[in-house]
């Protein structure tokens, strides 16, 4: 599950929402309507790796346990990050499980590969969107020709396989893959490999 972190508030959402509404209204007013084309904002989510959450890098790495972890202890900030991103990669597997996933409330569970409602997440291909949208719905493949998206992800083709309660209309949350976090605090929602926050793009649904 893609869970939009509060610390992504540095994205200027009022301005972004206004731009999305304006551009999509223009598309809707064409004689052919949207016709499988939307104007979207691409954001990023990822699977944080426990190995990056150290005191040396400025994280709260105090080892704690939570319901569902059977007494196994993990860095406090790592569990905070898993709570926001949905899954986390463990440094050492537990009973063959390389990941933990957030289970809601204050609870976690050991799991296999990160997945959404549409199966295992594939780095730089899987994406999440707000549920209930008629065009940008689960199972749809889209092309986002933005040069920024191509530069960050090395890809412009996505399949919507996931949802998230904090996602906005016309937002495509692109799955980056596994990485250590960029840094503590607000940078915990960013993978170490990029400082990307958001980019606008047209999105065409593949027929």
Model-derived regions, located:
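Acidic, low-complexity intrinsically disordered segments
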Residues: 2-14
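Solvent-exposed, well-ordered loop and adjacent helix/strand elements within mature globular domains
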Residues: 22-207
């Amino acid at each position: 599950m893609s869970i939009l972190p509060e610390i992504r508030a540095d994205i200027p959402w009022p301005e972004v929402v206004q731009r999305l509404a304006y551009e999509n209204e223009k598309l809707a007013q064409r004689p052919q309507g949207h016709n499988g084309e939307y104007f979207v904002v691409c954001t990023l989510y990822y699977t944080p790796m426990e190995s990056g959450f150290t005191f040396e890098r400025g994280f709260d790495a105090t080892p704690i346990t939570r319901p569902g972890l059977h007494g196994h202890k993990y860095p406090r900030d790592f569990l905070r990050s898993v709570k926001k991103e949905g899954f986390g990669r463990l440094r050492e597997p537990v009973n063959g499980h390389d990941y933990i996933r957030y289970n809601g409330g204050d609870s976690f569970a050991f799991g296999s590969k990160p997945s959404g409602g549409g199966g295992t997440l594939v780095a730089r291909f899987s994406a999440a969107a707000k549920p209930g949208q008629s065009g940008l719905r689960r199972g749809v493949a889209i092309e986002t020709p933005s040069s920024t998206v191509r530069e960050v992800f090395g890809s412009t083709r996505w399949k919507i396989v996931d949802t998230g309660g904090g996602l906005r209309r016309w937002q495509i949350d692109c799955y980056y893959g596994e990485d250590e976090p960029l840094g503590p605090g607000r940078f915990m929602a960013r993978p170490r490999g990029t400082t990307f926050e958001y980019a606008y793009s047209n999105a065409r649904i593949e027929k």
